[in-house]
């Protein structure tokens, strides 16, 4: 496939771009003017795919600008690109070289194009991100409170904890209002809440962390969450399966659902107990998390509420994990 690819190495202030030959190469500012130049370069050179490296959020503006202009753009993990460079023998590293390597990676692997979500879904994702930041800051303050030894510090820390609690309540209210103002998000939330052990708060987190829910198959959604089992085999050696990467905060939410489900969800309780007969506890929990996610994905895809009979039927049909 001779797809013409442009790689972009994203920095805080600048964007370095290159095609796989290095003939189309340069630097623009990471702002509106720079985006216009990039779009002109894409048009003049008949670029079919633009590939960006994830860069701690600095890539978001150019990503949304290109996707909003119907340009096919993909975002990839820096680790994968760096491993690709090493495999190709490209050990030197500069911004221009990185842009060319990203283009070559895109040409070889044809990454899945970014799907532009609705404005409200993007807002929900950003509110979810801010919520995580506040929780992290509150945990840090509580740790400081435990080792505080003077009255002034203790008083200051308690004020900060109170502030974070108020901000979290405000963020939760904003997320709820956003969901209720969007018919699709509200309907999805109601479908998720039909599952025993998923309440409004958990549904809110799942919607924020996984807007792709319902648009992928079961293997893709498990991989997205980092719940797809990885093999570690070689010759006669067969290692334990493991999970890695993926969306940590989505996994955290699913973990709490599975733990709560031991009391409130008959399907999860039965599945966990059956798996526990042959597998360690954590392995059984992860397997339940993966199965739960695929069930939720199917519910959103098929526009159906939780059905215990259907879930148990799937469990019987897939008795061997």
What spans do the regions from the language model cover?
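Phosphate-backbone recognition surface of nucleic-acid-processing proteins
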Residues: 200, 204-281, 317-318
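Low-complexity, acidic/Ser/Thr- and charged residue-rich accessory regions of DNA metabolism proteins
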Residues: 235-236, 240, 271-321
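Short alpha-helical scaffolding segments that buttress acidic/His motifs in well-ordered protein cores
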Residues: 105, 192, 206, 253-258, ...
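Phosphate- and other anionic-substrate recognition elements at nucleic-acid/protein interfaces
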Residues: 1-155, 159-165
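Short helix-capping/linker segments at secondary-structure and domain boundaries
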Residues: 109-114, 211-215, 261-267, 294-308
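Helix-hairpin-helix/helix-loop-helix acidic hairpins
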Residues: 145-201, 210, 265
């Amino acid at each position: 496939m001779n797809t013409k690819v442009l790689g972009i190495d994203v920095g805080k202030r600048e964007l370095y771009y290159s095609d796989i030959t290095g003939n189309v190469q340069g630097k623009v500012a990471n702002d509106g003017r720079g985006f216009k130049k990039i779009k002109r370069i894409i048009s003049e050179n008949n670029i079919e795919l633009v590939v960006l490296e994830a860069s701690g959020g600095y890539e978001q503006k150019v990503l949304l600008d290109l996707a909003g202009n119907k340009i096919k753009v993909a975002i990839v993990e820096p680790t994968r690109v760096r491993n690709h460079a090493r495999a190709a023998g490209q050990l030197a590293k500069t911004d221009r070289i990185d842009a060319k390597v990203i283009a070559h990676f895109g040409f070889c692997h044809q990454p899945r194009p970014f799907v532009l979500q609705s404005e409200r879904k993007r807002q929900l994702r950003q509110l979810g991100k801010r919520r995580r930041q506040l929780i992290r800051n509150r945990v840090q303050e509580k740790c400081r409170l435990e080792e505080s030894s003077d009255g002034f510090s203790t008083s200051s820390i308690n004020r900060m904890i109170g502030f974070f609690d108020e901000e979290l309540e405000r963020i939760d209210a904003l997320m709820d209002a956003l969901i209720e103002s969007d018919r699709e998000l509200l309907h999805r939330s109601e479908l998720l809440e039909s599952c025993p052990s998923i309440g409004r708060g958990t549904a809110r987190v799942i919607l924020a962390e996984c807007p792709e829910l319902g648009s992928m198959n079961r293997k893709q959604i498990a991989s997205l969450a980092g719940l797809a089992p990885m093999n570690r085999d070689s010759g006669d050696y067969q290692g334990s399966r493991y999970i890695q990467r993926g969306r940590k905060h989505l996994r955290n939410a699913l973990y709490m659902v599975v733990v709560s489900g031991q009391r409130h969800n008959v399907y999860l309780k039965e599945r966990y107990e059956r798996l526990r007969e042959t597998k360690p506890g954590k392995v059984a929990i992860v397997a339940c998390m993966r199965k739960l996610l695929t069930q939720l994905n199917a519910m959103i895809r098929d526009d159906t509420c939780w059905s215990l009979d259907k879930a148990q039927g799937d469990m019987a049909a897939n008795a061997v994990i």
